[in-house]
């Protein structure tokens, strides 16, 4: 029996969004078995309502793995004050909502409203979680929500970003069996199945090395600034190496802008009280989620874990001592908690089973039935553009796929130029 957190039913009440639950099988191979509830949010276009069909629906499949839809729009988003700091540094949906409604689904097991797992319970089972909270089940959950929320015959689009690409590919494979097809689906800076795990991880680390060097070019005294942040952390009784959690800020935006944002964030860190620093570290992926660790292994690095891969990439792509290093964060996956340390060590020795995917020929057949846009992104610290283009090649289908490179890093599709590209592509579809 897996441990779950309780979901507050008050999460349904909202003055702007339409929120709800859809019942779904816990195990789609046993539809008559136990069921869980999948939480969704339908966000209206600006100045509209959730039911306004004049604005088509875009289903945004968020990244992770292991993060709920609130990572893309907070549950307590301040609609009256869109520029409020509480809404986060990037409003991923503000451009989409000019013309579309957006449908978000909490992926099962994440810390949201869809059967959230209690990942702080020592009884968690990595193998069971990998099987039952897979990208395949998440794709089927999205289909169940679409069938409930989007009326039959009404066109909709999908954007699968980051880990969402795995869920998106699983969804496309369902269309071979008659699942509702989107009018078009975007795979933006996304993970894709059948990648070489070591090669893609080396590419990711090499891209972050380039971004560190670019940071030093833009901010010549960045080493000194980072040293001050380390001193600040140490003075508060925190591990100065937590500065490596800043890897998520590398390449976060277009060239010439993200570097200034990084420098400004360093200044903020020097003023933050201890509690706020710890929260910033958690919120910006400076700590490892165990759900992410499990699902990342099952989807991205079958037969390995993030930590076993990180040990190899650190040797293959060495860093200078001052540099921001994601691999340090990964090395701390156990968090210093004895049962977590044992859990992660056991996973490293015996990773969970790989998530099954349709074959490449089957996925190409599914792509041939759909309209697909792939968008590599410059400055992407997670899915480097060159690595992504290589991964895309096996899925290119003439007449069905297009590739458009975007500026702006990992969230490029949600920025202004990415949105213009989306509008132009969507408008070109029959």
What do the predicted segments below correspond to?
Residues 4-36, 41-236, 325-365, 370, ...:
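Gly/Pro-rich cap/lid or specificity-loop segments adjacent to the active site
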